[in-house]
UniProtKB/Swiss-Prot annotation:
GO cellular component, as recorded: cytosolic small ribosomal subunit
The keyword Transcription regulation belongs to this UniProt entry's keyword annotation: no
Name of the protein: Small ribosomal subunit protein uS8
Keywords of the record: Ribonucleoprotein, Ribosomal protein, RNA-binding, rRNA-binding
Keyword presence, rRNA-binding: yes
């Protein structure tokens, strides 16, 4: 099945896998999904990610992270903000705060994909890809 928005597909797969407490989630491997996975790993929301396969069959295997004995997922909600039909951009002064700073916004900037906090520190704006909390 062809997917037009690989990032939305990735977020949906993570959301569904965390609800049923799966450890590993396969997502399509693109530069954007790898960059978002790197940000999630740096923020401590996933354990790791690995590239697997060749060509069109390349997959990114994300290892989700859970807390406590009840295995509560660290990622409780993911929301796609900018989408192919309606792009959302924010300059450095308009960068959103997610849940008053508890969550993160993932921003695609001229310096790469980063969190809203990193973008504020770097003084750059960009496309608001998604919210994670």
């Amino acid at each position: 099945m062809a997917v037009n928005d690989t990032l939305a597909d990735m977020l949906t797969r993570i959301r569904n896998a965390s609800i049923v407490k799966h450890d590993i989630v396969p997502v399509p491997s693109t530069r954007m999904t790898r960059s978002v996975a790197e940000v999630l790993k740096m923020e401590g929301l996933i354990l790791e990610y690995q590239d697997q396969g060749e060509g069109k069959d390349r997959q990114l295997l994300l290892t989700l992270k859970y807390a406590g004995r009840q295995r509560r997922p660290l990622i409780t909600n993911l929301k796609r903000v900018s989408r192919p039909g309606l792009r959302v951009y924010a300059n450095r002064k308009e960068l959103p705060r997610v849940l008053g700073g508890i969550g993160i916004a993932i921003i695609s900037t001229s310096q790469g994909v980063m969190t809203d906090r990193d973008a504020r520190r770097a003084g750059v704006g960009g496309e608001v890809l998604c919210y994670v909390f």
